[in-house]
Amino acid sequence: MQRLLAPARRVLQVKRVMQESSLSPAHLLPAAQQRFSTIPPAPLAKTDTWPKDVGILALEVYFPAQYVDQTDLEKFNNVEAGKYTVGLGQTRMGFCSVQEDINSLCLTVVQRLMERTKLPWDAVGRLEVGTETIIDKSKAVKTVLMELFQDSGNTDIEGIDTTNACYGGTASLFNAANWMESSYWDGRYALVVCGDIAVYPSGNARPTGGAGAVAMLIGPKAPLVLEQGLRGTHMENAYDFYKPNLASEYPLVDGKLSIQCYLRALDRCYAAYRRKIQNQWKQAGNNQPFTLDDVQYMIFHTPFCKMVQKSLARLMFNDFLSSSSDKQNNLYKGLEAFKGLKLEETYTNKDVDKALLKASLDMFNKKTKASLYLSTNNGNMYTSSLYGCLASLLSHHSAQELAGSRIGAFSYGSGLAASFFSFRVSKDASPGSPLEKLVSSVSDLPKRLDSRRRMSPEEFTEIMNQREQFYHKVNFSPPGDTSNLFPGTWYLERVDEMHRRKYARRPV
């Protein structure tokens, strides 16, 4: 198999292809030769300036082929009806059998993305994985994914795994954009992979699990552009959720502390983001304050769906406290009694929560509710949770509705690391445009979720017990029928006596 061309030779080849097609680098191939998402099939010619509009070109979502219904779990666990479905806002929870692990999830989602876009494997120059599902303390998931690039001869691929609870995917996305806007960029695309298996021991936390992976193709001239200079970040040392027991998949969780940490990080990230965007506006002659009115859609890391509704309400409270008295009285009806409070005094105030949820309900329905479809029906995907929300948002709106909008995003990982950032959506929603094709690519999300097999709580519990039994077991082949997997799914075929893992793929 031909080795990857050297960078200088590659750029010459790109120029020759462009010339033969009578195209400049700024244009696309003829319609008959276009890849999905209108992505050029060859690497981009590098220039001396920053590439324009770096962001998400294509997106792929993977989740397991089986789920347990939360109403069934409520009955099985002998809790009151609505504890999970209303209290947590969860309807179904996807889960993996012992045939799937973090490597197989990421293999599946990357191969699906590459096959759908028909992008040459040597067009990828960076691949980074965000995950907290650690099955080896040394060997990265990224090294396993390199198996997919073997036939292309492409071994010149930067990036490695990034880990900090649910934040690793966002760090990987930022790293990809930073690489592309640096002197180290060689003109090729970046792949960002986020994936996790969220499992808990039997008890109150188990219904907040889930599993899945998201792969994103990053490049210039994207339909979802990362807004430059607009990241508000907060990091601190906290033991709200952590995994010190390396012999178990299960975390240690301080639930109340974790919610407080999440909300505190949200407050501080939002303040930092507002400060930066207002500075940009001020330099452009605009002295208006930034509020949620300047964001058409808002997505969040989603440990459970009810948390997201509280988080949007929290952002409204930030806007309320920073606004003038006139605006507080006119724009934020029902919140007047709380204008003397400080943010840090309200994390456990149920009266504030109740008033905020009521005041922000219409905004939640317009800006955020559609983004929770995957989380509601599949559960918490940890690092990929935020980007599953992005896919859900795209799947529930037309390209015309999304065009020109700003999508705010809040990413949180316990321990803790958090960022508030934003995407600017392309204004071009015409048929065949990158935006229209990106939206179209995730339009089957509801249909795919409905195609999964419903498992009983007893079957779910048995599989959780199997995962405990086989965790770090050697010299075995996982039990199960591979025909129960979705077509094209990679699975763990065997673990040998030296812990080496072998994978196979179910035929498409």
From Swiss-Prot:
Modified residues (N6-acetyllysine): 83, 118, 243, 256, 306, 310, 327, 342, 350, 354, 358, 427, 437, 447, 473
Post-translational modifications: Succinylated. Desuccinylated by SIRT5. Succinylation, at least at Lys-83 and Lys-310, inhibits the enzymatic activity.
Keyword terms of this UniProt record: Acetylation, Cholesterol biosynthesis, Cholesterol metabolism, Lipid biosynthesis, Lipid metabolism, Mitochondrion, Phosphoprotein, Steroid biosynthesis, Steroid metabolism, Sterol biosynthesis, Sterol metabolism, Transferase, Transit peptide
Transit peptide start and end: 1-37
Residues annotated as catalytic: E132, C166, H301
Catalysis performed (reactions): acetoacetyl-CoA + acetyl-CoA + H2O = (3S)-3-hydroxy-3-methylglutaryl-CoA + CoA + H(+)
GO molecular function: hydroxymethylglutaryl-CoA synthase activity; identical protein binding
Keyword Glycoprotein: no
Enzyme Commission no: 2.3.3.10
Subcellular locations according to the entry: Mitochondrion
BP term (GO), one: response to growth hormone
Gene Ontology terms: cellular component: mitochondrial matrix; mitochondrion
Tissue note: Liver and kidney.
Residues holding (3S)-3-hydroxy-3-methylglutaryl-CoA: E80, A81, C166, N204, T208, S258, H301, K310, N380, S414
Modified residues (Phosphoserine): S433, S440, S456, S477
Modified residues (N6-succinyllysine): K52, K83, K118, K221, K256, K310, K327, K333, K342, K350, K354, K358, K447, K473
Pathway: Metabolic intermediate biosynthesis; (R)-mevalonate biosynthesis; (R)-mevalonate from acetyl-CoA: step 2/3
Pfam families, per database record: HMG_CoA_synt_C, HMG_CoA_synt_N
InterPro entries linked: HMG_CoA_synt_AS (IPR000590), HMG_CoA_synt_C_dom (IPR013746), HMG_CoA_synth_N (IPR013528), HMG_CoA_synthase_euk (IPR010122), Thiolase-like (IPR016039)
Domain of life of the organism encoding this protein: Eukaryota
Gene3D superfamilies tied to this protein: 3.40.47.10
UniProt subunit comment: Homodimer.
Similarity comment: Belongs to the thiolase-like superfamily. HMG-CoA synthase family.
Task performed by this protein: Catalyzes the first irreversible step in ketogenesis, condensing acetyl-CoA to acetoacetyl-CoA to form HMG-CoA, which is converted by HMG-CoA reductase (HMGCR) into mevalonate.
Record protein name field: Hydroxymethylglutaryl-CoA synthase, mitochondrial
Organism of provenance: Rattus norvegicus
